[in-house]
């Protein structure tokens, strides 16, 4: 199967349009913090012959596929196995200080969803894993088995925004006392049995629970909250950051960081704005951009995307 059949990059032309002005110089460095199968990065490298790419991913399978896809670019590409909050350490390891661009395409990748054995999908039976890096960390089965009812309720509320969190947490605890919950099909069955018929008609009842478990297993929100400031800190003046998020919890973190850094810190009433109070960032899009209907028809994954972008306007003063 061709790679483009597995994953079509979302808003590719718009991302390139936003990043390209900062990446024209020979040797300009772009960090793709969520490399995946490198669909975006391959296009960036093709369009910008002087570009150097640093690709980060926590998933060894994705890195292997990306490595093959980008092999033709030779030493213009460096790949690093790390979570994206490790951007600073990754750049230090390569001897790179400032960069001209950082790109994030957040959420679970098509590769991970399509690999049934990874357990991300509630529509196919598989071991309850959900780790983006299958070589390390807590599995979803362990969360379901070991977290108490209050902890399960918390993550379903906080990470899934699930109104039926108390009901689902209670039923899971009851069910695991009878036998371990080790597969996605068994978890879906428990959730469906606990869901009122009227709610089931509104959409798949397991969607938010699976999202919450995935976020908890991979610590996605806490990682993003560390990664955003780390990425901005590495941008050279004139450098740009572009972020694609796919659910409101991620987008809030991105919005908060970009808004804070694009706002003057001058005290109220100060007659003159001092240089150290000027915004570090200039926003490049108004609010969050969404995909149009044509893009969504071509690539259904784009339906939920929210794109934000900013340019580094000044260095942070000590």
Swiss-Prot record:
It is found in: Cytoplasm. SUPFAM superfamilies: Putative methyltransferase TM0872, insert domain (SSF81799), S-adenosyl-L-methionine-dependent methyltransferases (SSF53335). Its EC number is 2.1.1.199. One of its GO terms (biological process) is rRNA base methylation. S-adenosyl-L-methionine binds at residues 38-40, 57, 91, 105, 112. It catalyses: cytidine(1402) in 16S rRNA + S-adenosyl-L-methionine = N(4)-methylcytidine(1402) in 16S rRNA + S-adenosyl-L-homocysteine + H(+). It comes from the Bacteria. Disulfide bonds: none annotated. Its main location: cytoplasm. GO terms for molecular function: rRNA (cytosine-N4-)-methyltransferase activity. Transmembrane segments: none annotated. Keywords: Cytoplasm, Methyltransferase, rRNA processing, S-adenosyl-L-methionine, Transferase. GO terms for cellular component: cytoplasm. It is an enzyme of class 2 (transferase). Belongs to the methyltransferase superfamily. RsmH family. Specifically methylates the N4 position of cytidine in position 1402 (C1402) of 16S rRNA. PANTHER family: 12S RRNA N4-METHYLCYTIDINE METHYLTRANSFERASE (PTHR11265:SF0), S-ADENOSYL-METHYLTRANSFERASE MRAW (PTHR11265). This is Ribosomal RNA small subunit methyltransferase H. The lineage of its organism: Bacteria, Bacillati, Actinomycetota, Actinomycetes, Micrococcales.
